[in-house]
Amino acid sequence: IILEFLFFWDAHVLFMMEKWKSRAGDRARGWFSDLGEWEALCSLAKLAADEPEWVFPKVNSVDDNTAAIVKGTSVGHPLLNEDRVANDVQLGPPGTVLLVTGSNMSGKSTLLRSVGVNIVLAQMGSVVCAKSFSLPPLHIETSMRIADSLADGVSFFMAELKRLKAIVDTAKKHDANNPKRMLFLLDEILQGTNSRERQIAVSRVVRKLIDGNAIGAISTHDLDLATTDDLAVACQTVHFAEQFEDVDGVRTMTFDYQMRQGIAETTNALKLLEMVGLGEEDDD
């Protein structure tokens, strides 16, 4: 306060700052950008140091169409602990889609998230949660956890349709000559309609994505989707399953979260109803 009163200190500081700004201010934005990039790289280096068993991915050539495949060995979700269950995953080649079926809570959505998060890490230059991982340069589009909007008057189903339309439009822009392949991850889409129309709609959406030279995966409870005329040839089917066992006379359900080939052969919705007390024997 005394310096300000005697020497107008604030005015001197302002004058010096304006002088510095005119001399070096144009370069300051670049300095802060470089500092931010350095901080991000330090974070990636810290992740590599904290997870010595993770690996750096291999990036395939964009000129090789046969290399337009995402392939990982023992891929796990980076945010889960050491008890995570890893699976071997392959998305592609173009013209195919990975169709993931399985009962509730079996691991379908977690698989898609594991693939997506590891791809993001890979394209940042980070290590990934896998024993091996290869991919081409990718542009990722997802449909997960869609939300409706009362304020905008948009229902859940309409919000999902708009999101899918945006994904399809992006796929059309990413033709074979684009430097980045488009990858889509669709988690149990179009649940807000009846099964017959859902099969038709999902088949149409996936066909448009495949025709756009995109690669990707879709999870679903619809076991008949893989047999539809549009997708029967294109689908690579995998599934997750549950196991039931009696523990002290109580019927319990467990999951091993291991991905298996083919379409799911079991469902568990009615069994879950019984387990929470909503079975037929609980009507009274």
Predicted regions and their residues:
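A conserved P-loop NTPase coupling/switch region
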Residues: I1-L35, L41, L47, N65
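ATPase nucleotide-binding head domains, primarily ABC-like/P-loop NTPase cores
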Residues: L44, E51-D284
